[in-house]
From Swiss-Prot:
Alphabetized PANTHER family for the sequence: ZINC FINGER CCCH DOMAIN-CONTAINING PROTEIN 44, ZINC FINGER CCCH DOMAIN-CONTAINING PROTEIN 44-RELATED
Compositional bias per record (Polar residues), positions renumbered to this chain: 1-10, 404-414, 699-708, 882-899, 906-915
Zn finger intervals (C3H1-type): 1267-1292
Stretches assigned to the SWIB/MDM2 domain: 313-396
Organism taxonomic ancestry: Eukaryota, Viridiplantae, Streptophyta, Embryophyta, Tracheophyta
Gene Ontology molecular function, alphabetical: DNA binding; zinc ion binding
Organism listed in the record: Arabidopsis thaliana (Mouse-ear cress)
Stretches with biased composition (Low complexity): 661-675, 813-829, 1188-1206, 1231-1244
Domain GYF: 716-770
Protein name (record): Zinc finger CCCH domain-containing protein 44
Length: 1292
């Protein structure tokens, strides 16, 4: 007990000291709370400050002091929050209960309109806690608007200046402003965010100072219950009582934003009515005496005091406008003396009351008469609107306060106000111009050492554009001092090239470049040193940017400055640098503004022009312009399309005939053959073949036979074609076909024909589009090959046929023959690709009575030469073994698809082939026995003549003379004394190129073995006027001489070796000069019959020993001529110069004579060897024959060269076939209605072209067939394949 009492006694001094601190702290409280703080006494503090320990022990100790027990009991239920108390409460006792919050008053809705202060049917604002009510007519809304569910907020919550949310509102009207607009608004704050506007505070001050109403210049009657002033007074008194507003609060109300800047806000507490002492309360709450450096603003309410208004002479009218002076003169009987604004308002209200101009339905609205319309310019104005409009007519005259004495101290007016009064008339200030002078008081840079903000505004002041720097180059000496410290904008390289990232860097210096560089129209060597983050770099001026800087770039610069990578910029630095760029920045801004205004002026002028009736009338009378397109003219389209299809025609013979895929494509003309028979009188021909009875060796150069495509063919609709469904479409014009072809609607090998023609006379669409028609140049197919044959009569029993080969140069060919007379056949071959004229080769042939053709041995001639004794000229030279891929048409009309040596009864045959490009050439022609004035020859005569013919064709050689190339045939007959020598002249240094490949197979009678004498070979030179065409093409297509050095003896030795091994024999040997076809160029891919062949000055000839060998071979039985494989090579001879072909006729067998004439059209096989059918050779070595007894399933799809062995000692050399670009292509389009005569399933194509390649499996090199779809590599067995495992061919 004693201890507790001692503790209580010891606590008394502490409480006393605490009370002293509380008393000192009360002095710091705002004077507005002085009355509340005075209620706290010193005697009450000890009871409120009892320690907690004492309180805890008070329950067990009986206390005599009832007051202490009462305090403890009251403090016991106090709940304390857990945790450390806030710092503000650290020094205060924890057990003191905070004062309870003031009870919230329920929102009361007002029952009068907030505008007219009258009752009636009112609507409430939907904003929360807004009690204001309005008449719908006062807010200019219909009652139907408020029946909707839409929410409506009154104008009290919207700033009247910027229409944003308001922050400060007036007590007695809908005036409200936001935080930004309050700086310039006529508004004073009374309590919190509530205050009074300049219009409402004046009548309120009149209401509050009614006792001093005698001092007012104008008296207003607020007691008239029928006036608006009475309603306003009632509303204010009710509001004042509800809010407990005092007169002191009204007098201390001000606008703190209109105080002098950069000074501590001071509140002047001054009550003019109670004469209280004014106190200036600082921020810290201590009293401070006002010094001479503390200016004050003039009181806003000084205008109501008559002492502040300067009285002027009655004649002075500078205080108001003309309209207001007229109104005042009317109200005061001509007195226009100076009045205050409040006096003018009183006069205006009296005038409205006297004239009864208020709207009876809306008391807040005034109906203006003629006098008020002049003053306000409206027929109807509101009350507050009227008072505001009146302010613009009153020029307020205030008495300047140069000095004011307060409590014995001198105070000065605001310096800015003194300066303003010194500039303008100190007696008159027009408030309408106040807003224009607000920029004069703009705050300048006070602290020049402060750090500048890194924003777009500041950086633009020191931003050096590229064009600025270009203008500074005129004065090179001042560049350094003007650019140092400026900011540049450069592009930085980033990972994403799509985004242009720029960086702001600062210039730290300049330097000179080693070499000058071009900068627009100027040349300079100035380089800029920049601080790029943390390193110095030197850049040229052309790397700078002229574009405006962005906020992101300023943000990155600000971040780099904060990281210490760049120097911090101060206000002085920016001002100093901006001064150097000020002139350039101003010039640029002015130019941009002037340009903008010029554009606006032009647009205004244009707008004025468009609004004028003259322009409208002119536009109505203007004739619209229609654009023209020359390409829509049909004649223009024809000429344009014709120019695309035509190309320059060269008179020279091209060295190579290329297919659709150029190199490496085998064109297999396994088409649909149509068998037709033509009688001699009805043979139709677009290329008439005339034979001169008197001079068969002269061929007239008739250029009129060659017809070019004309304009009529382009425009006329005469062309037909067949679609994939088999229907014939047409007629169409060439223009339409060309467009459809370019659009890809047609396949590459579509054939078309004219309306007056049939489908058999069709031509390729590609050739027709190129202007190559079949009028004079196309030999479409053997089935549609009409020829006119005119045989000449024979003077003796021996008949020889001279065939004149007409070349492209149309030069006459001289031939010679020992026979007394010979029949002549002249043919023009039409080539749609090259427009060549097939040369007719003069060879020894026999025609008997025009009905049967004497058998002739088979001779291979150049590709452009066709030899058909007495009947047909075929421009292709090729050996045609009797296989299933060649359809043989015999003269008697029998269709023979397989021809063997036994069927031919050992009859010799002559095959002359030419290179082709056109598809669908495997068509058969049946030639009947033509009428002839000569009697038919007997079989015995044919047998005798065959021997002579074989000898005449045995030495068919190529001779290159000074004037050209000559085919010469020298014959030495053992059975006939007559010797026939015929020459075929081929000029131009190159064999002509032909389009079709027709093979003529003639059965020859059996004769004795032939003895060939090489010495009898003669060379016939052509005339000097022959044209040389592409002479450089011959060496390019010839292999090296050392690669073609196999002789006939080597081949025959190989034949015997292969016979002993039981291998099948071949009638010919393989001509292989290329060991690697991969190195072949386009020149080596010459047309088939003369591929890898060139001319030589020497004559390729056979020895007698070779002839004897052939005699010995022919003594045996006749061998079966089986189905020929892909490649049928021919023998060659090795020479020191360019390589020549050797055509060695075999000895005929002694069997019956064949009277058959077979004409076979074969397809072109690019890259294959020229073949020569040697006739019915008996037991020739199988390696020479180069065919297999087993038919190849792909014999028709490829014709590649097979390998041949020169001797048993020589290593075999295999010619590699040409590569294929892909598998065979099945065409969707039908082949113009031609039916295929082949029954092979793998060759039953819809289109004649095939891309697949086959291989010769009968050459003796390979024993097994390749897998389906694979091809044999020719170089694998010989070990020459360099591709190895990467080779795309089959390695068996």
């Amino acid at each position: 007990m004693e201890n507790q009492q001692k503790q209580l006694q010891q606590g008394v001094p502490e409480l006393a000291s605490l009370a002293g601190r509380e008393e000192s702290s009360v002095r710091g409280i705002d004077l507005m709370r002085v009355d509340q703080c005075e209620e706290i006494g010193v005697n009450q503090v000890p009871a409120l400050s009892v320690p907690a320990s004492t309180v805890a022990g008070a329950v067990a100790v009986p206390m005599s002091n009832e007051q202490e027990v009462k305090v403890i009991d009251e403090a016991a239920p106090i709940k304390r929050k857990r945790g450390r108390p806030p710092r503000a409460q650290a020094n205060t006792p924890l057990h003191i209960r905070p004062p309870p919050p003031p009870p919230k008053k329920e929102d009361k809705e007002e029952d009068v309109c907030f505008i007219c202060f009258d009752g009636g049917d009112l609507v409430l604002c939907d904003r929360r806690n807004c009690p204001k009510a309005y008449h719908p007519a006062c807010i200019k809304r219909d009652e139907a608007f408020f029946r909707t569910t839409a929410k409506w907020n009154c104008g009290w919550h919207i700033c009247g200046t910027c229409q944003k949310a308001s922050s400060y509102m007036c007590y007695t009207c809908t005036f409200s402003v936001c935080k930004r607009c309050i700086k310039d608004a006529d508004y004073v704050i009374v309590r919190g965010n509530m205050g009074l506007c300049g219009t409402c505070i004046k009548p309120i001050m009149l209401i509050e100072n009614i006792a001093q109403g005698d001092n007012e210049a104008v008296k207003v009657d607020f007691d008239d219950k029928l006036s608006w002033e009475y309603l306003f007074k009632v509303y204010w008194l009710c509001l004042k009582e509800e809010l407990s507003l005092t007169v002191d609060e009204l007098t201390r109300a001000n606008n703190p934003w209109k105080e002098v800047p950069n000074t501590a806000p001071k509140v002047e507490s001054q009550n003019d009515h109670t004469n209280n002492r004014a106190l200036d309360v600082a921020v810290n709450g201590t009293k401070r005496r006002r010094t001479s450096d503390s200016p004050t603003l003039p009181n806003k309410l000084d205008g109501k005091n008559p002492s502040n208004i300067l009285k002027k002479a009655p004649g002075d009218t500078s205080w108001a406008t003309k309209e207001l002076l007229e109104f005042v003169s009317f109200m005061k009987n001509g007195d226009t003396s100076v009045l205050s604004q409040f006096d003018v308002q009183g006069l205006l209200l009296d005038y409205i009351k006297k004239k009864n101009l208020r709207d009876p339905l809306q008391k807040s609205q005034v109906l203006c008469d003629q006098m008020l319309v002049k003053l306000f310019g409206k027929q109807r104005v509101g009350h507050f609107e009227m008072l505001k409009l009146l302010e613009s007519h009153v020029l307020i005259q205030e008495k300047p306060k140069g000095a004011k004495t307060t409590n014995g101290e001198t105070t000065h007016a605001v310096p800015s106000q003194i300066e303003e009064d010194s500039v303008h008339d100190p007696m008159v200030r027009d408030r309408r111009r106040k807003m224009r002078r607000k920029t004069d008081g703009r705050v300048q840079n006070e602290n020049l050492d402060a750090y500048a903000a890194i924003d777009v505004h500041n950086i633009n002041l020191i931003y050096l554009r590229r064009k600025f720097l270009e203008s500074l180059l005129d004065d090179i000496n001042k560049v350094d001092e003007k650019v140092v410290g400026t900011i540049l904008r450069i592009k930085v390289s980033g990972s994403d090239q799509k985004l242009d990232i720029h960086r702001l860097v600062q210039v730290v210096g300049t330097s000179k470049a080693i070499a000058s560089y071009q900068l627009g129209a100027k040349t300079t060597d100035v380089m800029l040193e920049i601080l790029n983050l943390d390193k110095r770099e030197v850049i040229s001026i052309d790397q700078l940017s002229d574009q405006n800087i962005t906020e992101d770039e300023c943000k990155r610069l600000r971040q780099s400055i904060k990281c210490g990578l760049n120097k911090r910029l101060t206000v002085v630095d920016i001002l100093k640098t901006a001064a150097t760029l000020q002139a350039m920045r101003i010039n640029e801004a002015l130019e941009a503004e002037i340009l903008k205004l010029n554009h606006l002026r032009d647009r205004a002028k244009k707008l004025e022009l468009l609004k004028s009736p003259e322009e409208r009338q002119r536009l109505l009378q203007e004739v619209p312009e229609v654009h023209t397109d020359p390409s829509m003219d049909p004649s223009h389209a024809l000429s344009e399309d014709a120019g695309l299809g035509t190309r320059k025609q060269d008179n020279h013979v091209k060295a190579q005939s290329k297919g659709p895929q150029n190199k490496g494509v085998n064109l297999n003309n396994v088409g649909n053959n149509v068998q037709k028979k033509y009688d001699a009188p009805i043979l139709r021909s677009r290329n008439n073949v005339h034979a001169d009875k008197d001079d068969c060796s002269k061929v007239h150069n008739n250029s009129s036979n060659i017809q070019e495509t004309g304009k009529d063919d382009e425009e006329s609709e005469i062309w037909h074609y067949r679609d994939p469904t088999g229907k014939t479409q047409g007629p169409f014009s060439m223009v339409q076909l060309r467009r459809w072809k370019s659009s890809g609607h047609f396949p590459p090998y579509l054939r078309i024909w004219r309306a007056h023609e049939n489908q058999d006379e069709s031509v390729l669409l590609t050739d027709a589009l190129a202007g190559r028609f079949d009028k004079a140049t196309t030999l479409p197919s053997s089935s549609s090959l009409p020829q006119e044959l005119k045989p000449s009569p024979h003077d003796s029993g021996r008949t020889g046929a001279d065939v004149n080969c007409l070349q492209k140069n149309q030069m006459p060919v001289n031939t010679s023959a020992t026979s007394s007379s010979s029949s002549t056949v002249t043919a023009h071959s039409n080539d749609p690709k090259e427009k060549q004229v097939v040369a007719l080769v003069a060879c020894s042939g026999k025609v008997e009575d025009g009905n049967s053709v004497r058998p002739q041995p088979q001779v291979s001639c150049p590709a452009s030469i066709s030899v058909v004794p007495g009947h047909v000229v075929t421009p292709d030279v090729r050996e045609t073994p009797g296989t299933d891929q060649y359809n043989t048409v015999r003269a008697d009309g029998n269709h023979n698809t397989t021809k063997t040596l036994e069927d031919e009864t050992n009859g010799g045959s002559v095959s002359i082939n030419g290179s082709v490009h056109a598809p669908n050439l495997n068509q058969e022609s049946h030639f009947l026995d033509f009428p002839s004035p000569t009697p038919k020859s007997s079989p015995e005569d044919l047998e005798a003549q065959a021997a002579e013919t074989i000898q005449s064709l045995s030495s068919c050689v190529l001779v290159k003379g000074p004037s050209g190339v000559t085919w010469s045939t020298t014959t030495t007959s053992t059975t006939d004394a007559a010797t026939t020598t015929s020459s075929v002249v081929v000029t131009g240094g190159q064999l002509p190129q032909v389009i079709q490949q027709n093979t003529v197979v003639l059965a020859a009678p059996s004769v004795k073995p032939i003895e060939l004498a090489a010495d009898h070979a003669t060379a016939t030179q052509t005339s000097d006027n022959t044209q040389v065409a592409q002479a450089s093409g011959w060496p390019a297509i010839v292999a090296d001489p050392d690669e073609c050095d196999e002789s006939v003896s080597d081949l025959l030795a190989e034949v015997e070796a292969m016979e002993q091994n039981g291998l099948p024999s071949s009638p010919t040997s393989t001509f292989h000069c290329d060991d690697d076809d991969d190195l072949k160029g386009p020149e080596k891919d010459f047309f088939n019959p003369v591929a890898r062949m060139s001319l030589t000055p020497e004559t390729c000839r056979l020895d007698v020993s070779q002839t004897s060998i052939l005699d010995n071979v022919s003594a045996g039985k006749s061998s079966m001529l089986t189905e020929a494989k892909d490649n049928t090579p021919f023998s060659h001879c090795g020479t020191a110069g360019p390589e020549l072909l050797l055509f060695a006729p075999p000895p005929p067998p002694p069997t019956a004579i064949s009277h058959d004439l077979t004409l076979t059209t074969t397809a072109l096989r690019l890259g294959s060897e020229t073949t020569v059918e040697a006739g019915t050779v008996e037991r020739l070595p199988k390696s020479v024959l180069g065919v297999s007894s087993e038919p190849s399933p792909r014999s028709l799809s490829s014709h590649d060269s097979s390998s041949a062995r020169g001797s048993t000692e020589r290593s075999p050399r295999v010619s590699q076939p040409k590569r294929s670009s892909g598998h065979s292509r099945d065409r969707q389009w039908l082949n113009n209605g031609h039916n295929s005569s082949f029954n092979n399933s793998h060759n039953n194509r819809q289109w004649p072209y095939s891309n697949s390649h086959g291989y010769d499996h009968g050459s003796g090199s390979y024993a097994a067939h390749p897998p389906k779809g694979l091809k044999i590599c020719k170089f694998y067995e010989s070990g020459y394949c360099k591709r190895g495992a990467s080779c795309s061919f089959w390695h068996p």
